[in-house]
Each structure stands twice: as structure tokens, then as C-alpha cells.
Amino acid sequence: MTNIEPVIIETRLELIGRYLDHLKKFENISLDDYLSSFEQQLITERLLQLITQAAIDINDHILSKLKSGKSYTNFEAFIELGKYQILTPELAKQIAPSSGLRNRLVHEYDDIDPNQVFMAISFALQQYPLYVRQINSYLITLEEEND
């Protein structure tokens, strides 16, 4: 079987959960309030970056064990997990673009558009709990296969 280490994945899933809990504080903020608070913009940008990075780390760990030697872009890694039915193909397609926002936040490729980041808050709060559930289901499947 694979040498996937559940503890690596579980640790990152817990981090995603903690980050999502903090991001929920911004769930009902108005766009005007968000745009007028540089501090809130920085906090949400960082939380979105951390959520996405933890998912990327999970994806990389799983794929490195399933397809040793093959490398994927962060976007492709989400799609690949959909092909393996670890994520539903629908979720994989929906969530994969979040890796692009993460790259913009980390590397500041372009000016960061606070309107885009604002919209990403509700997206992350909807999609990443699904990601966590589907990865947890995959871990349960692995555990059952190893019993």
C-alpha cells in the first residue's frame, strides 16, 4: 500500500480548521468595512494563505506517495486528487484556483485586489470545510484498508 502518513495530514487538517474558525470572524463583514480596515485585510490575506498552503502540503504528501517522482503545480495537484476520487472532481475543480490566490498573496505577483480577497473569504468558508471532510474520509478509507 501507500506510505501516506496520516499524522502529517491530520496535523494540517487541524490547522485548516483553526484557520477557518478565525476566518469566520470576517464572514459577516461588509465590503466597505473590509476595504476601510487595512488590518482586517492583512489578517484575512494571511488566513487564506495559510489555509491554502496547508491544503497544498496535504495534496503534495498524498500525491508524492501515490505517484512517486511525478510533480504537479499546486493547481494540478487539486485536480489530480479529484482524478483519484480523494476529492470529488467537482470540489477539485472549484477549489484548485485558490492556489492562484495563494501565489499572489505570497509572491505578490500582482497588486493584491482587496475585492478579490474579500470574495475569497466566503469561498474558503464554503469550500475548505468540504475539502477537510473529503480528506478525512480518505484517511478513514486508508485506515480500513490497513486493518
Swiss-Prot record:
A motif (Y-loop) lies at residues 107-113. The active site is at 102, 107. Di-AMPylated by cognate antitoxin MntA on Tyr-109 when both are expressed in E.coli; GMPylation occurs much less often. Leads to an increase of mass of 659 Da. Di-AMPylation moves the catalytic His-107 away from the catalytic center, leading to loss of nuclease activity and thus toxicity. Probably one subunit of the dimer is di-AMPylated, the complex dissociates and then reassociates to di-AMPylate the other HepT subunit. Its EC number is 3.1.27.-. Changing residue 102 to A: Protein is no longer toxic, does not cleave tRNA, still AMPylated. It comes from the Bacteria. A motif (RX(4)HXY motif) lies at residues 102-109. The keyword ATP-binding does not apply. GO terms for molecular function: endonuclease activity; nucleotide binding; RNA nuclease activity. Pfam families: HepT-like. The keyword Phosphoprotein applies. GO terms for cellular component: toxin-antitoxin complex. The modification O-di-AMP-tyrosine is found at residue 109. Homodimer. Forms a complex with MntA, probably MntA(1):HepT(2) in vivo; can only be purified when both Arg-102 and Tyr-109 (or His-107 and Tyr-109) of this protein have been mutated. The fully di-AMPylated homodimer is not found in a complex with MntA. PANTHER family: MRNA NUCLEASE HEPT, UPF0331 PROTEIN YUTE. NCBIfam families: HepT_toxin (NF047751). Toxic component of a type VII toxin-antitoxin (TA) system. Upon cloning in E.coli inhibits cell growth for several hours; eventually cells recover and start growing. Cleaves the last 4 nucleotides from the tRNA acceptor stem (shown in vitro with E.coli tRNA-Glu(UUC)); only cleaves intact tRNA. Has no activity on mRNA. Neutralized by coexpression with cognate antitoxin MntA, which is due to di-AMPylation of the RNase. This is tRNA nuclease HepT. It comes from Aphanizomenon flos-aquae (strain 2012/KM1/D3). The lineage of its organism: Bacteria, Bacillati, Cyanobacteriota, Cyanophyceae, Nostocales.
